Structure formats: C-alpha cells, structure tokens
Regions:
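RNase H-like DDE/DDD metal-dependent nuclease/strand-transfer catalytic core used by mobile genetic elements
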Residues: 1-23, 27-135, 139-140
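C-terminal domain-tail junction helix/linker
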Residues: 87-91, 113-205
C-alpha cells in the first residue's frame, strides 16, 4: 500500500512550505517497508521508497514473489519508471478505481498516524529535521507500536511471525473487490448461454 502525504516546514513565524513523505506499507504485517521524503512531488522520491522496499526482497526468487503494489492513481505511481520497476521485479500493480479513500484505507490511516500521532506538535524548519524525525518515527512504528489489527503485535513481530496472522480489521478494498466480482457473476448468470450450431458433415467415399 503506497501513498504520499505532506508535512509543513516553517520558514519563519508566518511563512511555510511543504515537503512530501512517500511511504509503502506491508498490508499484511502493517510494517513500513519503504519511505522517502523530498521537497517536491517529483516521482524520484516515491521511487526511492520503492527501491528501499525492493532491497528487502532482493533474495527472494522472482518466480516466488506473489506481491501486489496498491496505490491511488497519482501520476507518480503511474509513471513509466515506477511501473517499470514494479514489473521488472515481478510485482503486480493495483490502483484505486476512483477517489474513494476507502480503496486505499490502510495507507490513509498510516498517513494520519504519522502526522497526528508520531509527528504531532513537532515544529520543523528544515528538510533535514523532517528526515531525522521520520527515521525515529518509522523505527518506533515498526518496532514498538502495537496494532489492534494484528492481534496487538508490533509490525516487526508480525513480520517475523510464522503461520497466518489473525487480522481484526476488515478490508474495505477486499469488500469492494468481492462486491464487483459478485456483480459480474450475476450479470454473467443472467446472460442465456448460446448453444453452438451442430453441423453434420457427410464424407463421400
């Protein structure tokens, strides 16, 4: 699950600008597996987050990877280089169908946690300060912050856990996909099957 969110940098008492945090979340373990922060919305920074993620799976044979990269339809995620990186590494691509935030709910929730919990009340004046704070926040999120959705484990513990994780929160995206599949099946069932014409062939001898 991937997304980009903004963070305020104060230039003085009244003027400010934004920097942009790109993060990639493992939807299964809730672990932040890649991130990057930059001064613009250039594709370069989401690519850095993706490269951090790819480094973690470099020893997994390509044919054994069953990964799906999900994001909104931002130009960064649809860019030629970003798509090439995913396909080169055998990762399937999934994108939201519209602007409904529930279709990327886990990433949206992570943005909220990062900005309104882990970075709450912090006053940044440089990009370097933001980067240093993100390093600490990601470490805390992955290694110390317990999650109800993964049975009160930390994401790092969940990543190291053997067997299937017990997930407590429903996936709005999975519900959406199932609803679409059921709708398609209902339409298909309503279409009468056409019997192929039977042709009799006489062979002369």
């Amino acid at each position: 699950m991937s997304d980009i969110t903004y963070i305020v940098i104060w230039l003085d008492a009244t003027r400010y600008c934004f920097c942009y945090l790109s993060m990639i979340l493992d939807a299964y373990t809730e672990e932040i597996v890649g991130w990057s922060v930059g001064p613009t919305l250039d594709t370069e920074y989401p690519i850095r987050a993706l490269q951090m993620t790819l480094e973690r799976i470099k020893d997994v044979p390509k044919e054994q990877r069953t990964l799906i990269h999900h994001s909104d339809r931002g130009v960064q995620y649809a860019s030629k280089r970003y798509v090439e990186l995913l396909t080169e590494h055998g990762i399937r691509i999934s994108m939201t169908e519209d602007g409904n935030p529930k279709e990327n709910a886990q990433a949206e929730r992570l943005n909220n946690t990062m900005k309104n919990e882990l970075l709450k009340d912090k006053h940044f004046t440089t990009l370097a300060e933001v980067t240093a704070a993100i390093i600490v926040a990601v470490s805390f999120y992955n290694e110390e912050r317990m999650h109800m959705s993964i049975d009160m484990m930390t994401p790092r513990d969940a990543a190291n856990c053997t067997g299937e994780l017990k997930k407590h929160w429903k996936s709005y995206r999975q519900e959406h996909i199932k609803a679409k599949q059921a709708e398609a099946q209902a339409v298909e069932a309503a279409i009468p099957m056409q019997q192929p014409a039977v042709t009799s062939l006489a062979r002369s001898v």
